[in-house]
Amino acid sequence: MGRLAVEQLAAGYVEGIDILTDITLRVEPGTITGVIGPNGAGKSTLLKAIFGFLHPKRGRISLDGRDISAMAPHEIKRLGISYVPQGANIFPQLTVEENLLLGAWVIRSDKARVADRLERAYAAFPRLRERQHRRATMLSGGEAKMLSLAKELVTEPTLLLVDEPSAGLAPRIVEQVYARLLEVRGQGVTILLVDQNINKAVHVSDYLYMLERGQVRREGPRRDFADQLREIVRDALLGA
């Protein structure tokens, strides 16, 4: 299903201080949930804690009622959670297509299903099709980020964690990335995304949380954030 619950989470430490101090949020199946906030608010730390790179000091993380707080990333991956970090998570020595095939191998599908997943990736990101036989080291930064996202999507995740999907990308590529996220949401994939592109995050998310200093400062459905966008942008970028 992909229902994620984070309850009173404290995690991530800098010089003995918790980055996340008391985070409670819900991500409903088949929705896009956006997380915004100023730099240093703990947004990326939240995704790392959910994926098992950081273990909570306090609190609980659960998927469909199952406690995953103490699981390692490879165990969480087996549950159908995929993580797209801010930097490109690809194998530079492999070609574009080999990276996608490696992602598809995770689900151990038959050849027809793998071919279908690759075709969907190429349809969503035509530049990857044009470069399918190039080594990943030859890609631009934007192309590498597209490949990083596509590689995780071919694993057919139940829950997708995406960190800063629009950072450093040209506007045209940002549109392609978000169009793909909306497409997979329509196919039932649950998405939790962090993005400094607040306008875009508000536009695509069904529900949003704004973090500040490791806590949830504001939450609500898209319409609430859209109605107060100027105030929210100011608070999210500068902190209140």
Model-found features: residue ranges?
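ABC ATPase C-loop
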Residues: 152-153
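Helix-to-loop junction immediately C-terminal to a conserved catalytic motif
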Residues: 51
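The feature captures the beta-strand-to-loop junction immediately N-terminal to the Walker
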Residues: 36-38
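Conserved ABC ATPase signature
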Residues: 135-139
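ABC-type ATPase nucleotide-binding domains, specifically the catalytic core motifs of the NBD
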Residues: 14-15, 96-116, 124-126, 220
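C-terminal boundary and immediately downstream tail of ABC-type ATPase nucleotide-binding domains
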Residues: 81, 123, 210-219, 226-240
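Conserved ABC transporter NBD signature motif
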Residues: 59-66, 79, 113-118, 220
